[in-house]
Amino acid sequence: VTNQFQCERLIQAGRSVADISKTDLIVLNVQSNEYPANPDAIQYLFNIASQNSAMMNVMYAEDIFKTIVQYIRENKTAYVVTGIPQTKNSVLHQIWNKFAHVTFFVVDEKGTLHEVTDKSIYQKSVVHS
């Protein structure tokens, strides 16, 4: 979750995926060591996760990409729900292409869930349905 204060739609969509797939819902927040932590944002994220029966992990890392990749690998993650990449250079594209066995979903601004089927072109402008 990139912006903790706009995460509710992502977590709710994740709850739907977890319910359908009969898997656990885990909210992962990876923050850069370069920026100070925002306790209000973390508390808000925790509250939304709790309301949706999700476990929450907050991690601090110098290399966010590497940390997320390692987390997905170590936890044998089957489904990942994120927001829509804002640019074609987004770290999300790199993560999507790293894992053939993981099903990725994005959630648009309206809260609609979309499966990522073409990992090379999916950008914000593509998801206006």
Regions found by a protein language model. Name each.
Residues N52-Y79, Q86-K88:
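Structural beta-alpha unit
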Residues K22, S53, K76, A100-T103:
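Residue-level detector of structured alpha->beta connecting loops
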Residues Q12-G14, T67-Y71, V91-I95:
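A short acidic, amphipathic alpha-helical/loop segment
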Residues G83-S129:
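Gly/Ser-rich helix-loop-strand patches that form or flank binding pockets
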Residues V1-Q4, V30-Q31, A61, T82-Q86, ...:
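Structural motif
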Residues V1-N52, N57:
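Small/aliphatic-rich secondary-structure junction motif
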Residues I42-N47, R73-K76, K98, Y122-S125:
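Short, hinge-like loop/turn segments at secondary-structure boundaries
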Residues I26-V27, M56-M59, Y79-V81, T103-V106:
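Short hydrophobic alpha-helical runs that function as membrane-insertion/retention elements
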